[in-house]
Amino acid sequence: MMQRLFLAVVLCLLAPSLAFAQWQDNLVQHHNAQRVGLPALVRDARLDRAAQLHAENMARQGRMSHVLDGRGPGARVCDQGVCRIGVGENVAMGQRTTGEVMRAWMASPVHKANIQGRYSRIGVGYSSGFWCVVFAK
């Protein structure tokens, strides 16, 4: 009985992190599915961190923007050790699923251009209804 209880507690603790990882992978898969004829984007943990921190900051401030606290995507990505020319970013708010946010981005020519751009790496973030995807060459 005690072993079952322990296993149940462990599974409950792991479930959110597993679901989060699945969500991240799913969003990257959606991006790569839209890049027909282009190389697949590769996840980069540093870009994930930049995107996640920005999503959390947007949620905390309750507004969607590429520039918060006077800092844009290039500076935020550089903070994570990826200091280079060729950074792009898509942000969104209000969508409840990865499919919804991808449909919104693909319906916008500017966001679609980022998704189908000449980038090789990607990082994704989400917090309380705010989405952020960062691209780098």
Predicted features along the sequence, with ranges:
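Bacterial N-terminal signal peptides that target proteins for export
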Residues: 1-9
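A signal for specific C-terminal beta-sheet/loop modules enriched in small/flexible residues
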Residues: 8-11, 20
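N-terminal signal peptide c-region/cleavage motif recognized by signal peptidases
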Residues: 14-16
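Functional surface patches built around histidine and acidic residues
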Residues: 18-137
